[in-house]
């Protein structure tokens, strides 16, 4: 399958799934100076994007003061950081402010253990405190992630270039009621 960049929307913040972490795992807030931890996790987990040392600063450096409130690390009971998710925002997308689920990653050694949905619960609840709607960016080869996002009530954004082709490809390998409701 060709790897298209896609956007997904959630136009309201009600009925956020409340998924607890499995035994042995939890979540904590980012602490100042922990960009290197974020980078380590992203490098380990990211198959498509080159993670250079300056990425964290480019993505978050202009708003480091809000990171402890908006960025989270999935941790083991021993305190090892093995995942990350950020409840960010875009001040002017489509003419209004939107919350943004941003840079979700679970270290490959811990993928498949049911950690993404609990992390999404935490980030979505944080977004709900400040935003009436949210979106995220992902790509079509991240089928497991797309299923998580669909399960959290995100819909395909269909106004982007190649969106019909992209979501048709996703629907060819992932059956989901939201995709069906969107005509795929």
Predicted regions, residues:
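Conserved beta-strand-loop-alpha-helix junction that forms the acyl-donor binding cleft
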Residues: 136-146, 162-169
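A short beta-loop-alpha structural element at the N-terminal edge
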Residues: 26-38
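A conserved beta-strand-loop-helix scaffold within acyl/acetyltransferase catalytic domains
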Residues: 43-106
């Amino acid at each position: 399958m060709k790897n298209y960049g896609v956007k997904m929307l959630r136009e309201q913040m009600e009925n956020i799934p409340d998924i607890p972490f499995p035994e042995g795992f939890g979540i904590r807030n980012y602490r100042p100076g922990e960009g290197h931890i974020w980078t380590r996790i992203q490098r380990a987990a990211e198959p498509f994007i080159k993670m250079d040392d300056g990425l964290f600063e480019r993505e978050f450096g202009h708003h480091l003061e809000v990171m402890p409130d908006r960025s989270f690390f999935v941790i083991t009971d021993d305190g090892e950081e093995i995942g990350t998710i950020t409840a960010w925002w875009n001040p002017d997308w489509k003419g209004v402010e939107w919350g943004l689920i941003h840079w979700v990653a679970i270290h490959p050694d811990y993928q498949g253990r049911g950690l993404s949905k609990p992390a999404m619960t935490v980030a979505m609840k944080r977004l709900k405190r400040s935003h009436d709607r949210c979106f995220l960016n992902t790509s079509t080869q991240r089928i497991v992630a797309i299923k998580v996002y669909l399960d959290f009530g995100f819909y395909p954004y269909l106004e982007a270039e190649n969106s019909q082709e992209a979501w048709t490809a996703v629907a060819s390998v992932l059956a989901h009621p939201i995709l069906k409701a969107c005509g795929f």
